[in-house]
């Protein structure tokens, strides 16, 4: 038997040939990909030729325009320059079309287009596929099943829970008054709204605002909200594998594990309680049914119940949507009143007329605050908690002015742009609650702090109740004053925040009329 031995030069030649072929294949694939991106960009340019926009870089698009937390200023500039809608390019072949006209909003929100996958996929590890991220028939089934959880009869007992949480926050503020320095309110309000959600969703005992045992869970929730937004703004993090290898990816994984573990433990404990014979009747006698009770007892139309994974997703979605969004709304409302003392005093007089005898705030009081409600709505116009929402067109669409967009285009409904559109809101920077006076004429889609259409915020009433309770109890105890040295700079995150915080000075009111629960 003969054995042939390749010489070193022949072996090297074989390896070199393989490397050359591999390099050529990689180059060919890159050329094909580049050609695909070029052709796709050309298709987009043709599809969007009816929608002018500022000049963009061929690779980076308009990304640089939206750096340094200037997105909201850029949106306002576009609203004034480009009627109704304006594309903005990101990374060459990707584009979003911003809409900020009420007629355009009405068209899109009247359709059943799915949420934009590119904009919302980063939330999936955080909250799972609950009502916010679901689409199609599954979304419809979950929406129908969850609607009873937000019925007025269910929401009524929550008013007392909201008041309890607000009172704890105000007590903390009173302790801090001795420091004679402005108070950054958003962090306090965010913790208070999380406290309210914990009580409403889980019947949590005590207050996480003062419970040190809850700090790790609170930190995980806060970290996830920040990490998700940073991930959305980094093109390299769009790839799950790459993101998982980064420090932020590992941090996100740990925070998700902690948050999900907490939710899972609560769900399993409650399931075990409800499975005991007669336990449900005992619960009803002791307390109101909370969000988790209703989820566990609910059934689909086919008689099936939610899986543990679906339960966690819906609970985490409720926690996410009802926490930072409401905190943003309350914080900006307090700032708006601090900078408009006449409106603040008129709201206080209205609330004093309802609760001035020391009455506890109840469900029935919430509909007896017309001027306070007008001020809340005007603050939500100026500072919408959710700056924008995304949709991916499932079919072509034609707008009332004749312009059209093809299937597959991502549209961003800029609620901030809509609320700051001078063609919709004259003197738009003026805080004018009379815009929302009874009988005032408005386009049906000119004011969308809770979105609109079939996919509007299911917890709208819950949120409005909390805004009213927080506003009422705060004004009864404190006079709100702005800090002229630190004027808030609004910036778009998952919710509307301030780049430098929301700092207010508080002045304790003499002989405050507080609700009976404080006695």
From Swiss-Prot:
Catalytic activity as recorded in UniProt: an omega-methyl-long-chain fatty acid + reduced [NADPH--hemoprotein reductase] + O2 = an omega-hydroxy-long-chain fatty acid + oxidized [NADPH--hemoprotein reductase] + H2O + H(+)
EC numbers on record: 1.14.14.80
Alphabetic keyword roster: Endoplasmic reticulum, Heme, Iron, Lipid metabolism, Membrane, Metal-binding, Microsome, Monooxygenase, NADP, Oxidoreductase, Phosphoprotein
Key word Oxidoreductase present: yes
Gene Ontology CC terms, in alphabetical order: endoplasmic reticulum membrane; extracellular space; intracellular membrane-bounded organelle
Record membrane topology: Peripheral membrane protein
The protein's name in its UniProt record: Cytochrome P450 4A22
Gene source species: Homo sapiens
Taxonomic lineage: Eukaryota, Metazoa, Chordata, Craniata, Vertebrata
């Amino acid at each position: 038997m003969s054995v042939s031995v390749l010489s070193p030069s022949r072996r090297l030649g074989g390896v070199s040939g393989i490397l050359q072929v591999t390099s050529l294949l990689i180059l060919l694939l890159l050329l094909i990909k580049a050609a695909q991106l070029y052709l796709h960009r050309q298709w987009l340019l043709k599809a969007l030729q009816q929608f002018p926009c500022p000049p963009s870089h061929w690779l980076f698009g308009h990304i640089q325009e939206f750096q340094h937390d200037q997105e909201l200023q850029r949106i306002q500039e576009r609203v004034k320059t480009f009627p109704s809608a304006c594309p903005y390019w990101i990374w060459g072949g990707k584009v979003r079309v911003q809409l900020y006209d009420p007629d355009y909003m009405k068209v899109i929100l009247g359709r059943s287009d799915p949420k934009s996958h590119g904009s919302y996929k980063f939330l999936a590890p955080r909250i799972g596929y609950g009502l916010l991220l679901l689409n199609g028939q599954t979304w419809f089934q979950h929406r129908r099943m969850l609607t009873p959880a937000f019925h007025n009869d269910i929401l009524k007992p929550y008013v007392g829970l909201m008041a309890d949480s607000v009172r704890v926050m105000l007590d903390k503020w009173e302790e801090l008054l001795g420091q004679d320095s402005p108070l950054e309110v958003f962090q306090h309000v965010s913790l208070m709204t999380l406290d309210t959600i914990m009580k409403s969703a889980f019947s949590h005992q005590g207050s996480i605002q003062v419970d040190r045992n809850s700090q790790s869970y609170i930190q995980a929730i806060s970290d996830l909200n920040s990490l998700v937004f940073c991930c959305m703004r980094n093109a390299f993090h769009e790839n799950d594998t790459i993101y998982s290898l980064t420090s932020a990816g590992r941090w996100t994984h740990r925070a998700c594990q902690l948050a999900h573990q907490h939710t899972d433990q609560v769900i399993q404990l409650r399931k075990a309680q409800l499975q005991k014979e007669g336990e449900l009747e005992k619960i009803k006698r002791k307390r109101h049914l909370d969000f988790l009770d209703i989820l566990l007892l609910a059934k689909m139309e086919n008689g099936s119940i939610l899986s543990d994974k679906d339960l966690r997703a819906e609970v985490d979605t409720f926690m996410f949507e009802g926490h930072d969004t409401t905190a943003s709304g309350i914080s900006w409302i307090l700032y708006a009143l601090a900078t408009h003392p006449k409106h603040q005093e008129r709201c206080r007089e209205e609330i004093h007329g309802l609760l001035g005898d020391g009455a506890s705030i109840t469900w029935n009081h919430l509909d007896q605050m017309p001027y306070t409600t007008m001020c809340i709505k005007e603050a939500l116009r100026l500072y919408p908690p959710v700056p924008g929402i995304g949709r991916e067109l499932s079919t072509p669409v034609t707008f009332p002015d004749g312009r059209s967009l093809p299937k597959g285009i991502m549209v961003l409904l800029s609620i901030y742009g809509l609320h700051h559109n001078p063609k919709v809101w004259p003197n738009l920077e003026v805080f004018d609650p009379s815009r929302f006076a009874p009988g005032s004429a408005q386009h049906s889609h000119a004011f969308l702090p809770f979105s609109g259409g079939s996919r509007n915020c299911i917890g709208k009433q819950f949120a409005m109740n909390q805004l009213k309770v927080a506003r009422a109890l705060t004004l009864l105890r404190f006079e709100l004053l702005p800090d002229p040295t630190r004027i808030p700079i609004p910036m778009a995150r998952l919710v509307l925040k301030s780049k430098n915080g929301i700092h207010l000075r508080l002045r304790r009111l003499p002989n405050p009329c507080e609700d009976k629960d404080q006695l």
